[in-house]
Amino acid sequence: MTANFSTHVFSPQHCGCDRLTSIDDVKQCLTEYIYWSSYAYRNRQCAGQLYSTLLSFRDDAELVFIDIRELVKNMPWDDVKDCTEIIRCYIPDEQKTIREISAIIGLCAYAATYWGGEDHPTSNSLNALFVMLEMLNYVDYNIIFRRMN
């Protein structure tokens, strides 16, 4: 006797891509990536080259934030403002380096995965997305565009 289970695999637009074609795609791609990160591994599409690059940003998060697992566990992800203030203690807004920008993305992706749901995002994993969007600006998107391509 076998069970027939139908599972939805989350497959965002940029997941299978190798690169971005326009700076205008960066914010959308990062939004999709954090959302994708909040799904269980078996419920999301395999990463293409572009998402593999984004996954490597977790290494930058380890360098900047040291123990990201403990940081992610202890941050108040139910409060976006408090989370951004904590991150700003590590990384001031003015003149962020490429490593610091990547670390913010890596930290938020780690949080989305850590707090994510089985087949859908949770409020904490969605707040990781909102924290990233709050922390990054157009200049940061330009810098990340160059690193992603």
From Swiss-Prot:
Homodimers. Interacts with host IKBKB; this interaction inhibits host NF-kappa-B activation. Gene3D superfamilies: dsDNA poxvirus (1.10.437.20). GO terms for biological process: symbiont-mediated suppression of host NF-kappaB cascade. This is Protein OPG200. The keyword Transferase does not apply. Keywords: Early protein, Host-virus interaction, Inhibition of host NF-kappa-B by virus. The keyword Ion transport does not apply. InterPro entries: Poxvirus_B14/B22/C16, Poxvirus_Bcl-2-like, Poxvirus_sf. Belongs to the orthopoxvirus OPG200 family. It holds the Pfam family Poxv_Bcl-2-like. It comes from the Viruses. Contributes to virulence by binding to the host IKBKB subunit of the IKK complex and preventing host NF-kappa-B activation in response to pro-inflammatory stimuli such as TNF-alpha or IL1B. Mechanistically, sterically hinders the direct contact between the kinase domains of IKBKB in the IKK complex containing IKBKB, CHUK/IKKA and NEMO.
